[in-house]
Amino acid sequence: MPDHTPPPSGLDGAGLLVVDKAGGVTSHDVVSACRKALRTRRVGHAGTLDPMATGVLVLGVERATKILGLLSLTTKEYTATIRLGAATTTDDAEGDVVSRGDVSGVPDSAIDDGVAALTGDIEQVPSSVSAIKIDGRRAHALVREGETVVIPPRPVTVSRFEVLQRRRSADAIDLDVHVECSSGTYVRALARDLGAALDTGGHLTALRRTRVGPFTLEHARTLDELRADPRVSLDIDAAVATAFPRRDVSAAEAESLSQGRWLDPVGIPGVYAAVGPDGRTVALVQERGKRAGSVMVVRPATLGP
C-alpha cells in the first residue's frame, strides 16, 4: 500500500542524521537512501567518506542542511588496518599491487619509530586517488585515466597514531591502528608513508571512522535501522546543542534575532547558539565588533510556532 504521509514542513523532521556507513557504498548512495527513507530531497552531507570505508557520516535534513557549513568538524578519529609488505596504486586494498617488500627483518622498534615520525604536525602528500581537484578535475579521475598525478604536500596534524595490535605472516605485517587527526588528513597516506619509510610498501586494508567533530558512532545508525525507523539522529535543537556553544537570550532578544536584528556581544568566540526562554534555538550567532549578528536564523519570525 502506498505511503500517503505528507513530507515534513517547517522544522518538522529537521536535524542531523549520523549514519554508520557500510563498506562498498558511496556517500552519494547514502544521501540517496536517506532522501528515500525520509521522503525529502533536502538532505546533504558534511563531507564524504571513501566507498571502502565504514563509519560516521554526518548529514543535514530539511532546514538543518543550512548548518552543515557552520559545523566545526576539524578533528576526526579512525580505526584502521595497515598492511606492510606491498604498495598499491590506490594506497588501499582496492588498487593493484605496484611493489612488494620483505617484512621479515622489520623489528617492532622500527615500526614504532616510523609511526612516531608520522605523528604531530607533519607535511603530508594526499593520496593520488583523493577528491582533490587539479586544474579543475578530481585527482582520482585523472589516475583512472592513466595520468600521473602530483599533489603538493600540505600541513596536517596527527594528534594520535597508535598501534593497537600487530600480526605477522611470511609476507606481511598487519597493524591495527587508532588515528586522531585534523580534517584533510589521509589515513591511506599514513599507510603509504609508513611503508615507504620501512622500505616494505604499505596500504590500508580496512578503515572505519569513529568520530567527526562531536559526532560519534554512539549517535549513528545504519541505513537498515533508518529504513525501519525513519527519523533524524538529532533534531535541530539537539544538533545545535551538541555542536555549538550556548548563549541564553531573553524573549525580547529572541524576537529580535528571529526578525534578523542583532544583539550586543558578550564575548563568546566563534559561532554559537542563541537559545530562548523556551529552550529552543532561535539563531546561530557570531560576534563581529560591537554586534552579535545571526549567521543562520533557525526559527525566523515568518516560520511560525
Feature locations, PLM:
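Accessory RNA 3′-end/elbow-binding domains used by RNA modification enzymes
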Residues: M1-H45, L49, A53, V115, ...
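The conserved catalytic core of RNA pseudouridine synthases
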Residues: K36-L38, V58, V149-A191, A196-D199
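Glycine/acidic-rich beta-strand-loop module
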Residues: R42-S72, S128, A141, E145
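Residue-level signal for inorganic ion chemistry
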Residues: L59, A80, G136, L190, ...
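Acidic, low-complexity central loop/insert segments
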Residues: A64, G69-P126
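Short, conserved beta-turn/loop elements at beta-strand boundaries and strand-helix junctions
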Residues: T88, G120, Q165-A170, V212, ...
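Short, structured loop/turn "capping" segments at alpha-beta junctions
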Residues: D121-P126, P153, R188, T200-A206
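Extended alpha-helical targeting/anchoring segments
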Residues: S130, I134-P153
